[in-house]
Amino acid sequence: MSSLAAPQTGLLRQYLVLTKPRVTQLAVFCAVIGMFLAAPGMPDLSHVVFGTLGIWLLAAAAFAINCLIEQEVDARMLRTARRATARGTISDIQVLSLSGLLGGAGMLVLYHLVNPLTMWLTFATFVGYAIIYTVILKPRTPQNIVIGGLSGAMPPALGWAAVADSVPAEAWVLVLIIFIWTPPHFWALALYRNNDYIKAGLPMLPVTHGQQFTRLHILLYSFALLATTLLPYAIRMSGALYLASALALGGMFVWYAWRLYREYSDALARRLFRFSILYLALLFGALLIDHWVGLLR
């Protein structure tokens, strides 16, 4: 039994890697925050559970398609060369079947157990990432992250729609925050993985415009991000607790970006990249805590 289970476990692990679980977790986390912010009190737990499940399934399906489309590119990059699609240990049909199963299940869950609006918005996000970003933008323009960032910024709106069956201005403010966060996050990665992107032939900003230009734009975007994160307080969507958190976290982001701009090192770029992930999680966590504190008043 153990000899039979080992290959099956290995295959399941390879499937899991194709769904980019860490990236999926952050996206779903932001969607869940949107769900709780959408309700004046406690949201309908069935919508939270099934909304989370459906969004996770479609996100995983999109990432699997991304790995399938980019398998030749991934094989040339050190960071992604071990993916099953890049090594050819999983066939195209297997990946398509996995994506179809996950995506189909996600759409059914969202349509029948949440609401049609959430399903269509999540499906549009799937198309935006798996097709428009991966196929059209990423291999053709250094602004791929800027233009294609909208699909990655959508989770709060998807979560909001799951609970409220609408997407008001407050939800789009959250989308805007992630949209502005995305370029400096990925450009930091592209800086210290520059050789990978050169080998892959992808026109990331450091490849096409150089390191100094990219570092300047990371710094400029960090200031824009700090300003954008003040919007929830400005429109009275959040209170002083969130404001203090946004200023502190934004100040740290600017500080990292300033250091990177003044004196580059791969270690600093890697540190900024990792901090940016923590930054987004803490910022959205602060939004939720501030929301709950407001409900208790």
UniProtKB/Swiss-Prot annotation:
Record's subcellular location: Cell inner membrane
Regions crossing the membrane: 23-43, 49-69, 93-113, 117-137, 144-164, 171-191, 215-235, 238-258, 275-295
Pathway: Porphyrin-containing compound metabolism; heme O biosynthesis; heme O from protoheme: step 1/1
GO molecular function: protoheme IX farnesyltransferase activity
Domain of life assignment: Bacteria
Example GO BP: heme O biosynthetic process
Enzyme Commission number(s) from the entry: 2.5.1.141
Gene Ontology cellular-component annotations: plasma membrane
Major location category of this protein: membrane
Catalyzed reactions: heme b + (2E,6E)-farnesyl diphosphate + H2O = Fe(II)-heme o + diphosphate
InterPro entries named among the record's database cross-references: Protohaem_IX_farnesylTrfase (IPR006369), UbiA_prenyltransferase (IPR000537), UbiA_sf (IPR044878)
Enzyme class: transferase
Keywords: Cell inner membrane, Cell membrane, Heme biosynthesis, Membrane, Transferase, Transmembrane, Transmembrane helix
Topology in the lipid bilayer: Multi-pass membrane protein
Pfam families in the cross-refs: UbiA
Role, per record: Converts heme B (protoheme IX) to heme O by substitution of the vinyl group on carbon 2 of heme B porphyrin ring with a hydroxyethyl farnesyl side group.
HAMAP family, sorted: CyoE_CtaB
Misc: Carbon 2 of the heme B porphyrin ring is defined according to the Fischer nomenclature.
Similarity-based family: Belongs to the UbiA prenyltransferase family. Protoheme IX farnesyltransferase subfamily.
PANTHER family: 4-HYDROXYBENZOATE SOLANESYLTRANSFERASE, PROTOHEME IX FARNESYLTRANSFERASE, MITOCHONDRIAL
Protein name (record): Protoheme IX farnesyltransferase
Organism annotation: Bordetella parapertussis (strain 12822 / ATCC BAA-587 / NCTC 13253)
Name of encoding gene: ctaB
